[in-house]
């Protein structure tokens, strides 16, 4: 996940508390709200597996079944422990608190206040929208047995790794999770095919960006990934496209994939490459995670370490707002130049400051980076704006990123997004400034990730939204999560859907598109906005490889055929 600078440690009661924002389907359009086979079996239903069923299943997977105990349980009821509760609250903003859990999620909206550590002690601790159980996957056999059990018992299946997800795809009420987090194999090897000859890495689905980067660096290599070190690479990040700081240099994360190793819904083990099972390869490579098959490993290109320059720039809104946004515009003016020089940039505009960084320049000198920023610094001097600018040249991307992308604490942000082409951005500079200013004035923030995908970057055909390839910037519009004010959080989600995203969409032809990993889960017309012209073909392949809809997540291909009822059970839509 290409995470905004204020969200990188984030690429989130009673079940009915969560408003039914996730689907346009109404209760009347659902085939059933009970235990009919049109709905996934739910705790309390007659069809729910018995304790003996769960025991037998646990034995079949070598004792790797985990019954969910929410992290917040130490803050409630008979399990209350004041010291441990304080520790959980203090650790809650850190990604590692959640990524090593078999049930927790980093997008708190989709936890739905389930056993929330910030609710009063007397509030009952319920599993709520967390998965009921998860299998700590260690082998293909674990995946196959879990798929078979979930279908035999008509259970909701959730494929999860780290819980990094803005759409709640990593959890589900009444769900059985396939927890891929501990598949940590990492094999660097030589690779030869018609499409690519060179170094490659075959990594397990549990490998996270930071682990990959550190291991590859020691071998003189760089692997394309996002910024956030705790994001799992083989899941939604790469399967959803894979924007990152090396996009301009090497292409998207999806463009690096040489092979997918997966298990289909029917339990068949399969390898997909550009020449073998090529239709599945095409769908997995950009068509969204957790949709067509369970990926247990992937093989990707590995690139030699090379000189990389990093940079940061920050300045406050310390006086006139008009003057501050003139400074923001000065930075906007150099974004195309950063891309043209082979670099990428990430920045965030808030009402009180602009924070730019990391700016990443692979194969770029410090002198080149400084020359690109010179017009901005001159403008800031002329405006009498105090700023901090730093740049440095390193022998590798790994070292540059370590210096210019320090970890940020935040696990809460509700977001929307839009992709913006160069011509739209440079052709209406005042329009974008006014839209961003309006969002910031209402307590929101706007993060941009700039890049440029050249046609000279060769890759096999894949299902990445063509609009992502044509764009200069992926904008994310966010509102920080407030752990202690649910009503305000719900209001802020409405702001994103009904005000903030439309403000940017109004500046774009036909309302624009969005990067499917970082957008509003309530996006109207998400099929076109997230997947573009590829949606119909992807839907056809969904029917080929998952005809019974075993894999489901909000805004995944084919997800409109299912919806959650008021109590969050998953049912087919009539």
From Swiss-Prot:
SUPFAM superfamilies cross-referenced by the UniProt entry: FAD-binding/transporter-associated domain-like
GO molecular function, one term: oxidoreductase activity
Pathway: Secondary metabolite biosynthesis
Glycosylation site positions: 58, 112, 136, 266, 312, 363, 384
UniProt-listed InterPro entries: BBE (IPR012951), FAD-bd_PCMH (IPR016166), FAD-bd_PCMH-like_sf (IPR036318), FAD-bd_PCMH_sub2 (IPR016169), FAD-linked_Oxidoreductases_BP (IPR050432), Oxid_FAD_bind_N (IPR006094)
Entry keyword set: FAD, Flavoprotein, Glycoprotein, Oxidoreductase, Signal
Family: Belongs to the oxygen-dependent FAD-linked oxidoreductase family.
Function: FAD-linked oxidoreductase; part of the SOR gene cluster that mediates the biosynthesis of sorbicillinoids, a diverse group of yellow secondary metabolites that restrict growth of competing pathogenic fungi but not of bacteria. Sorbicillinoids biosynthesis requires the action of two PKSs. The SOR cluster is required for the production of trichodimerol and dihydrotrichotetronin, with sor2 being sufficient for production of trichodimerol, but not dihydrotrichotetronin in the light.
Protein known as: FAD-linked oxidoreductase sor8
Source organism (scientific name): Hypocrea jecorina (strain QM6a)
């Amino acid at each position: 996940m290409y995470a905004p600078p204020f969200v990188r440690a984030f690429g989130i009661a009673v079940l009915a508390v969560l408003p039914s924002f996730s689907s346009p389907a109404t209760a009347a359009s659902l085939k059933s709200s009970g235990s009919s086979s049109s709905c996934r079996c739910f705790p309390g239903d007659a069809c729910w597996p018995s304790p003996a069923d769960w025991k037998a299943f646990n034995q079949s997977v070598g004792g790797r079944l985990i019954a969910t105990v929410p992290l917040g349980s130490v803050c409630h009821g008979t399990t209350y422990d004041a010291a441990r509760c304080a520790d959980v609250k203090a650790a809650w903003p850190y990604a590692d608190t959640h990524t090593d859990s078999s049930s927790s999620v980093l997008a708190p909206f989709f936890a739905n206040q389930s056993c929330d550590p910030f609710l009063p002690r007397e509030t009952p601790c319920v599993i709520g929208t967390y998965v009921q159980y998860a299998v700590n996957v260690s082998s293909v056999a674990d995946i196959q047995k879990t798929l078979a059990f979930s279908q035999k018992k008509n259970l909701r299946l959730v494929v999860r790794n780290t819980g990094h997800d803005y759409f709640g795809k990593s959890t589900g009420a009444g769900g059985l999770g396939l927890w891929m987090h501990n598949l940590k194999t990492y094999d660097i090897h030589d690779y030869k095919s018609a499409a690519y000859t060179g170094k490659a890495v075959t990594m397990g689905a549990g490998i996270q960006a930071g682990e990959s980067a550190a291991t590859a660096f020691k071998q003189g290599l760089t692997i394309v990934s996002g910024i956030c070190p705790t994001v799992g690479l083989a899941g939604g990040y790469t399967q959803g496209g894979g924007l990152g700081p090396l996009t301009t240099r090497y292409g998207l994360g999806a463009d690096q994939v040489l092979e997918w190793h997966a298990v289909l819904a029917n339990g068949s083990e399969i390898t997909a490459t550009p020449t073998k099972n090529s239709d599945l390869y095409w769908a997995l490579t950009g068509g969204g995670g957790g949709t067509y098959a369970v990926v247990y490993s992937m093989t990707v290109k590995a690139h030699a370490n090379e000189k990389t320059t990093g940079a940061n720039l920050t300045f406050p809104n310390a006086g006139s707002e008009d003057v501050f946004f003139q400074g923001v515009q000065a930075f906007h003016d150099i974004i195309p130049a950063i891309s043209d020089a082979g670099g990428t940039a990430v920045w965030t505009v808030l009402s009180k400051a602009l924070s730019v960084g990391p700016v990443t320049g692979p194969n770029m000198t410090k002198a080149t980076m400084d020359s690109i920023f010179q017009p901005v610094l001159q403008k800031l001097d002329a405006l009498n704006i105090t700023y901090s600018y730093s740049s440095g040249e390193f022998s590798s991307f790994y070292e540059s990123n370590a210096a210019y992308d320090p970890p940020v604490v935040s696990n809460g942000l509700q977001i929307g997004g839009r992709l913006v082409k160069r011509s739209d951005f440079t052709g209406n500079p005042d329009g974008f400034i006014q839209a961003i200013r309006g969002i910031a004035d209402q307590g929101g923030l706007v993060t941009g990730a700039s890049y440029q995908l050249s046609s000279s970057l060769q890759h096999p055909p894949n299902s990445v939204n063509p609009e992502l390839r044509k764009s200069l910037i992926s904008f994310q519009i966010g509102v920080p999560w407030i752990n202690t004010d649910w009503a305000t959080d719900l209001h802020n989600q409405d702001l994103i859907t009904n005000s903030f995203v439309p403000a940017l969409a109004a500046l774009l032809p036909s309302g624009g598109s969005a990067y499917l990993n970082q957008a509003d889960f309530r996006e109207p017309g998400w099929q076109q906005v997230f997947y573009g012209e590829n949606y119909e073909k992807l839907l056809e392949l969904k029917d080929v490889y998952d005809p019974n809809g075993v894999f489901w997540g909000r805004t995944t291909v084919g997800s409109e055929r299912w919806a959650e009822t008021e109590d969050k059970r998953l049912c087919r839509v009539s």
